[in-house]
Amino acid sequence: VGKGYGIFFTCLLYLTIGPLFAIPRCATVSFTTGITPLLGADSPEQLYLLLFSAVFFAFVLFFSLRPGKITVWIGKIINPLFLFFFAVLMLAALLAPGAAVSAVEPVEAYRSDAFFPALIEGYGTMDAIAGLAFGIVVIDVIRRMGVDNDDAIAEDVLSSGLLTGALMALIYVVSIVVGAQSRGLFELSENGGIALTQIAGHYLGGVGLFILAFTITFACLKTSIGLVTACAETFSKMTNGKISYRSWAILFTVFSFAVSNIGLSAIIEYSIPMLMLIYPPAIALILLAFLGKFFAHDRTVYIATMTGTWAAAIFDCMKTLPAPVQAALHLDAPIAFAAAHLPLFDKNLGWLLPAVIGFAAGMAIRASRRQTPAALS
């Protein structure tokens, strides 16, 4: 699209999967699954969250400034241990379900057109935008393994991406089934961390809760260290080293610590407007990259498509802002305008038609430019 846009979008991607949402969420997920079940009903949960997140981010900062064997150890031992424990938990739940999925009454949002709210809920995984941000890391790793041919690199990235996608899809599907079946045992949970804790406690008892807390905390710690490191390195490079890696790492860690103390449910709620803004351009960019060979990656097509996508995504973002913010910014009129003129706006997909129109306009401009020299000759 352009160098300036590339810098802007890269910053937005890394901030979203970094200090704004993903890093704080790692700390709150660890707290929700590991510490909350141990607290009494009258315990000052907010105080315990403050203390836990302070210790959590102290470790994050320490190891982000001293990257070494700890992250390798966590990656090679703790992550596989968590996956093994998760597989045992899911198998136990599937073999003794709390209720049949068909017997569970869906919540209001999923009683009709379940696909659309589920699609938007999928934004919360941040998988697509993380793929854009860290795809270059995968390529660098493959090159360090001695693969220099671009076609071979593309083939390796594709095969590893397909395998990763298939495994992630399997994990998501199994988690959805187990979560639905658990409605026969528990009331609807406020967030997934609470649900996972309840399921682990029911099927595996106190030992299961301890293992879950241990493995998730260390897995989230490794993820946070990796995210702080990646964000700090990226922003240090973008500022040409004028602001050091150390300064960025400290800034991102302190900011993440502050955000984490609003709690997991609040982080999820406040992340929705940002994800509604950033996901449509991310999806459009991915699709354009796949289709680029058909228009020689013409910059005009990219710019036109991105223009249409961003223009509509802003309305989707407005719609999902908290009601007090909408009222303070007097957004009723623009939201009503979008609802009246953008198809699928009520499904949070109002950006689709503008993106298609932008793509068509870009292709038309490209075609007219190619025809003009021929006509003159």
Regions found by a protein language model. Name each.
Residues G4-I17, L50-A54, D113-E121, H202-A219, ...:
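Select transmembrane alpha-helical segments in multipass membrane proteins
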Residues G6-G40, C220-S236:
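Hydrophobic transmembrane alpha-helices that form the core helical bundles
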Residues V55-I78, R144-V147, F257-Y270, I286-A296:
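Membrane-water interface regions at transmembrane-helix termini and the short interhelical loops
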Residues L15-P19, A92-A99, E108-V178, G208-T223, ...:
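Hydrophobic, membrane-embedded alpha-helices of multi-pass small-molecule transporters
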Residues R66-I77, F115-A118, V138-L167, L185-T197, ...:
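Hydrophobic, small-residue-rich membrane helices and short re-entrant helix-turn-helix hairpins
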